[in-house]
Amino acid sequence: MEKNNRIKRKQNMKIYSLYRMLSLDRIFYYAIEFLFLTQVKNISAADVVLKSSFYALFMIILQIPATIVVEKLGTRRCTILGNIFNVIYLSLIIFSTNFEMLVLAEFISALCFSLKDISDTTLLTQSIPACSKKGEIFSKLEGRGSKNYYYINAVTSVLAGFLYVINPFIPVIFALLVTILATIMSFGFQEIENEELKNEDKKSRKSNISIISYIKELKDGFKFVIKSRRLRSLMLYSGIIWGAFCLISTYRTSLLKDIGTLEQLIAIISAIVGIASGIGANGLLYFH
């Protein structure tokens, strides 16, 4: 089994960075998202922001169920499932006709990332053999994928702006094709058989540990977070920053459009933001 696991680990580590580059987020899409929803789907700017609020709410609700699902189904299956949800999300965006369909799409998106945020990194962690440089290898592979995503996202953002002028559906369809490619790549991952995890699973079954007791442990964890001033501050800070980021990314495009900025220039500005994010991701890898 150990020899078989070595082959699986090599396979997973070989494709992870490329997979992460294509699946970290939606390439081609975000540069034209606001324009597509407001101009093509006739959704108001306020509703575009509101749908992001629904996404945040769904993510909070799904965190505990997603953890349980990953634990039950395994990291590989959940990674594949998350990417399939991503394909469904973009399909709903293309065919959406009203705000209610957008809310449904945001729920599907929350299903996607609540699973992927857990399963992707856990899959990589399990794929790296136990050694003194395990953390370094993880940071290198994860950082390389994230950095390359931001750079390729910058290039595709520019392309998306010019393609949007030709036909607004073209960049969204390209985003869907990239997501389908990432889904196909996710089938190449292998589940790592871990004897220790199997033994722990057997012990948990013998001791009749149920989902209810698991949720109780999480509640105890939340109580600890609430009592900790530092953790409360960290959660508040993260919430404010994330909310500000959503507002800025949405209203940036709205303001640029209101002052008569061309779609191509809006895409170029998004590309510059993407390049800055890539530099930041590279710096994070260096300092880590």
What are the language-model segments listed below?
Residues 1-10, 189-234:
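Juxtamembrane intracellular "pre-TM" segments in multi-pass secondary transporters
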Residues 2-61, 228-273:
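Helix-loop boundary and gating motifs at the non-cytosolic
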Residues 28, 56-64, 150-154, 158, ...:
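Residue-level signature of mid-helix packing/kink "hotspots" within the transmembrane helices
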Residues 36-40, 93-95, 150-175, 258-259, ...:
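Transmembrane alpha-helix termini and helix-breaking/packing motifs in multi-pass membrane transporters
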Residues 61-75, 164, 279-288:
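Helix-to-loop junctions at the C-terminal end of transmembrane segments
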Residues 84-98, 102-103:
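C-terminal ends and interior cores of transmembrane alpha-helices
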Residues 107-150:
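Cytoplasmic helix-loop-helix junction between adjacent transmembrane helices
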Residues 170-188:
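Symmetry-related core transmembrane helices of the 12-TM Major Facilitator Superfamily/SLC fold
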